[in-house]
């Protein structure tokens, strides 16, 4: 009984039981760490002073971009019948999206490969066009015999 009284006295003395801390990320409804981004902004010396809303805004923008890229990469993985996102899927997602492609145009993704592209001039003609041309004219002109070289 004396132990419970001591706890009550201690609770009154120090302001009650400690409340669970609420982070800035939780207050903003974000997954990205607002406090850490704020610390990086201050430590990086991008400006003399950093406003209280700047890290929240930057965290929200980064979270949105990450969600957008991951959604498109997940779709690319699904199109390739894979369950794991690999750098190739990230590259396909970014390069096939016009806005993300422009934003990340100078970025090289390791193990991403290249976008498949064949110049239309190099593609074979359609079968219908071949049949029409074959009936109208020979495929190649007849070769003429060369005159023998003089020694």
UniProtKB/Swiss-Prot annotation:
Protein name: Histone H2A.2.1
Biological process terms in GO annotation: heterochromatin formation
Entry remark concerning the domains of this protein: Contains 2 SPKK motifs which may interact with the minor groove of A/T-rich DNA sites. Phosphorylation of this motif may regulate DNA binding. This motif is reiterated in both termini of histone H1 and in the N-terminus of sea urchin histones H2B, but its presence in the C-terminus seems to be unique to plant H2A.
Family: Belongs to the histone H2A family.
Short sequence motif SPKK motif 1: positions: 140-143
Modified residues (N-acetylmethionine): 1
Region ranges (Disordered): 1-22, 129-151
PTM statement from Swiss-Prot or TrEMBL: Phosphorylated within its C-terminal part, probably at the SPKK motifs.
Positions with biased composition (Basic residues): 140-151
GO molecular function terms listed in the Swiss-Prot or TrEMBL record: DNA binding; protein heterodimerization activity; structural constituent of chromatin
Lineage, uppermost ranks: Eukaryota, Viridiplantae, Streptophyta, Embryophyta, Tracheophyta
Role this protein plays: Core component of nucleosome. Nucleosomes wrap and compact DNA into chromatin, limiting DNA accessibility to the cellular machineries which require DNA as a template. Histones thereby play a central role in transcription regulation, DNA repair, DNA replication and chromosomal stability. DNA accessibility is regulated via a complex set of post-translational modifications of histones, also called histone code, and nucleosome remodeling.
Gene Ontology CC terms, in alphabetical order: nucleosome; nucleus
UniProt superkingdom: Eukaryota
Compartments where located: Nucleus; Chromosome
Principal localisation: nucleus
Extent of motif SPKK motif 2: 147-150
Keywords attached to this entry: Acetylation, Chromosome, DNA-binding, Nucleosome core, Nucleus, Phosphoprotein
Pfam families on file: Histone, Histone_H2A_C
Assembly description: The nucleosome is a histone octamer containing two molecules each of H2A, H2B, H3 and H4 assembled in one H3-H4 heterotetramer and two H2A-H2B heterodimers. The octamer wraps approximately 147 bp of DNA.
SS bond list: none
Gene3D superfamilies: Histone, subunit A (1.10.20.10)
């Amino acid at each position: 009984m004396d132990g419970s009284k001591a706890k009550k006295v201690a609770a009154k003395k120090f302001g009650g039981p400690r409340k669970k801390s609420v982070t800035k990320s939780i207050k903003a409804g974000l997954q990205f760490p607002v406090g850490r981004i704020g610390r990086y902004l201050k430590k990086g010396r991008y400006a003399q002073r950093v406003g209280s809303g700047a890290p929240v805004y930057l965290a929200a923008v980064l979270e949105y971009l990450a969600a957008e890229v991951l959604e498109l990469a997940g779709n690319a993985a699904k199109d390739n019948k894979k369950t794991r996102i690999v750098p190739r899927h990230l590259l396909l997602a970014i390069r096939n999206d016009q806005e993300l492609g422009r934003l990340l145009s100078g970025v090289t993704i390791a193990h991403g490969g290249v976008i498949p592209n064949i110049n239309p001039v190099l593609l074979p003609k359609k079968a219908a066009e071949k049949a029409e041309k074959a009936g109208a004219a020979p495929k190649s002109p007849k070769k003429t015999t060369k005159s023998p070289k003089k020694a």
